Amino acid sequence: MSISLLLEMASSTDPDRTAIVAGDLRLTTGELSELADGGAGLVAASGAAHVAYVGAGGAMLPLLLFASARAGVPVTPLNYRLSADGLRALIARLPDPIVVVDDEYREAVGDGFRVIGSAEFLAQARNAEPAAEFPDPDSVGVVLFTSGTTSAPKAVELTHNNLTSYITGTVEFASAEPGDAALICVPPYHIAGVSAALSNLYAGRKMVYLTQFDAREWVRLVETENVTSATVVPTMLDRIVTVLDEQGATLPTLRTLAYGGSKVALPLVRKALELLPGVGFVNAYGLTETSSTIAVLTPDDHRVALGSDDASVAKRLGSVGQPVPSIEVQIRAEDGTVLGAGETGELFVRGEQVSGRYTGIGSVLDDEGWFPTKDVATLDEHGYLYIGGRSDDTIIRGGENIAPAEIEDVLVEHPHVRDCAVVGPEDPEWGQIIVAVVVPAAGTDPQPEDLRDFVRAQLRGSRTPDRVVFRDELPTNATGKVLRRDLVSELSSAAKEPA
């Protein structure tokens, strides 16, 4: 099944339903379908083998997803926040592309590629000779570059079948109520942005786009557009909670708030649940290579865990929930042995929505179709999945493997800690040492030794940070993932400076 069919189903069922609200632009499903046909005609006439998009999103993302599909070529939304050199390097890795670019990023793209402005593409699509085909479901529909927080960005190839398997396996067609609206503020170059466009269109929800995130504007849009569902990343949730606390807003129309993209501190989750008791919170865990979500902590899971006196149940608030029905999971030891409940190892996943294929590398699935996520994980006896961070982040201190997440989960519970990251810069004596980078809570002045004592009291002595340093903010990417390499580089450089 191709993603073209998702739009065909939506537009033929209710062509007059509002599909997109992006600033002053409003499009019905019928209008989106017509523009996609015209956009496909533009792409086909250009002779391009690939469509690249450099921009903040809004209506352009769903339009280019479907226009590219109907032209029979893949599309790649790119990170518009990259440097000009970084952006051009990624475009150069795409085969014979046409680059659709928002005006403010035109200079960054440069003159070395075939380029058309987003506004011009939209205008020409209204009158272009249409083209519409349903591509081979096994052909590549979307290529996304990984964030590159631990290595150089890889180009993940997602087929139409990968994407539609995720949508049809997790969303019921036309299941939304007539007044339902989804607020989308995740970046277009992230898998969450792609899946939000496809899943909300398929469900029948109006999509309200906020292309430049601002917490006050987010709250305003929820209230004025009667938003019923939204998806945010941890840094966004933190800012939204701050605004809600200041304003006392209750957001009565909001029924579901999904969060994901990176680990969320439990005190923040508890605060959000306290401020919005009528909202169903969803923790969604997935990867680019899995076409989005593969495990979900449901609203009921949140409520039960928050209100439970049973430590084993309350602990679930820190999990990513249970795998979705279409996904199989295994936890494996380093030697490939499949581990049992409660044992920690690398997470492997399998399912129709799982790609595991990279441009220039090929498939990394094993002979039985399992994908190595590189995430350290544990599956408990009730099927709840706990993610302990990336295997690449593991600190090896004096020959002992230490998961940063274990220490971070303790530190963030200290009342004087708003956020933290634990990293392992190299050390001539220990191989690596444990350094906790802490963002203090507002109005507090935490002392390094107090925080070290706090960790030591709850974990083994070998888990106690060797050093504690303070920062106003942690460096993160657009989805809230901490840029650990930047922290390690900064700490290593500081260690080399003369006293």
Predicted segments with their positions:
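Conserved pre-ATP/AMP-binding loop-to-beta segment of ANL
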Residues: 3-4, 128-145, 152, 175-181, ...
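Conserved AMP-binding/adenylate-forming
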Residues: 25, 40-82, 401
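Conserved AMP-binding A3 loop
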Residues: 28-31, 141-168
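AMP-binding/adenylate-forming catalytic core of the ANL superfamily
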Residues: 82, 230, 351, 356-357, ...
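ANL superfamily adenylate-forming
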Residues: 103-138, 310-311
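Conserved AMP-binding/adenylation subdomain of ANL enzymes
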Residues: 164-181, 189-229, 243
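Gly/Ser/Thr-rich phosphate-binding loop
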Residues: 202, 227-231, 243-314, 328
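Conserved ATP/PPi-binding loop(s) of AMP-dependent carboxylate-activating enzymes
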Residues: 319-326, 334-368, 402
